């Protein structure tokens, strides 16, 4: 389906009836953000062993690929820092994560175009090999949950269909979480949707959908 040079129109139409979408979830690119890596381990476990109709539907109809930690060295340092701080006496100052990301730290998520970092190259190889339908990068910025759409102006290279799909997915997130009584889930007002150097934009340059949570 990804290469019309190898697949005829008739073959593509037949594949559409049986092929499963691939949902690729990543997290841990920013080492001080702890929630995503922890949650993805739990999610992987539930997808494997849980037998509820909800999980069975996902397991039967979607191929889910999970990379719980993109920046593995920084994650190790974050874990070490956390356990060191637990040894500090009550009232003592807690040390922040002093060094991670091989000089770039938070800007390792600004390498989607330059492709200078090994972690970016690894994600690109993943995209090229598995061709996921959606790449979903998990972050952590506040006590709320932001599902990405952007305020605009959107990047000129983005197809309007892609922007509509952003909104469709985000609105479904907000609807489903609200239906389950989860407060603080929102979209729109967090970033603009213009700068194409985020890691999830790798998906957009390979005919897929990139999105993120904060």
Regions found by a protein language model. Give the residues of each.
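Active-site/substrate-binding loop(s) of hydrolase catalytic cores
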Residues: 2-29, 34-168
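Primarily the internal scaffold of c-type cytochrome electron-transfer domains
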Residues: 98, 156, 160-164, 173, ...
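Acidic/His-rich catalytic or pseudo-catalytic neighborhoods
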Residues: 96-97, 112, 179-184, 209-214
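Phenylalanine-focused residue identity feature
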Residues: 54, 116, 186, 190-191, ...
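Active-site-adjacent mobile loop/cap segments within catalytic or ligand-binding domains
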Residues: 144-149, 194-214
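Conserved alpha/beta core surface patches that mediate binding of polyanionic ligands
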Residues: 4-8, 128-134, 188-205
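Acidic/polar loop patches that form or flank catalytic/metal-binding clefts of enzymes
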Residues: 135-137, 170-189
């Amino acid at each position: 389906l990804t290469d019309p040079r190898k697949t005829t129109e008739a073959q593509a139409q037949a594949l559409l009836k049986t092929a499963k979408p691939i949902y690729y979830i990543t997290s841990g690119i920013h080492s001080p953000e702890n929630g995503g890596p922890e949650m993805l381990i739990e999610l992987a476990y539930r997808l494997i062993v849980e037998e509820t109709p909800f999980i069975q539907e996902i397991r039967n109809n979607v191929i889910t690929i999970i990379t719980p930690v993109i920046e593995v060295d920084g994650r190790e340092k974050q874990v070490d820092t956390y356990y060191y701080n637990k040894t500090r006496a009550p009232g003592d100052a807690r040390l922040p994560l002093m060094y991670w990301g091989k000089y770039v730290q938070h800007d390792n998520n600004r390498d989607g175009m330059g492709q200078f970092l090994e972690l970016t190259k690894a994600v690109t190889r993943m995209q090229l090999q598995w061709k996921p339908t959606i790449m979903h990068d998990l972050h952590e910025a506040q006590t709320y949950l932001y599902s990405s759409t952007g305020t605009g102006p959107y990047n000129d290279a983005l197809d309007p269909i892609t922007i509509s799909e952003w909104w469709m997915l985000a609105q479904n997130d907000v609807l489903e979480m609200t239906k389950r009584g989860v407060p603080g889930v929102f979209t729109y007002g967090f970033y603009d949707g213009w700068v194409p150097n985020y890691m999830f934009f790798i998906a957009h340059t390979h005919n897929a959908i990139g999105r993120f949570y904060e």
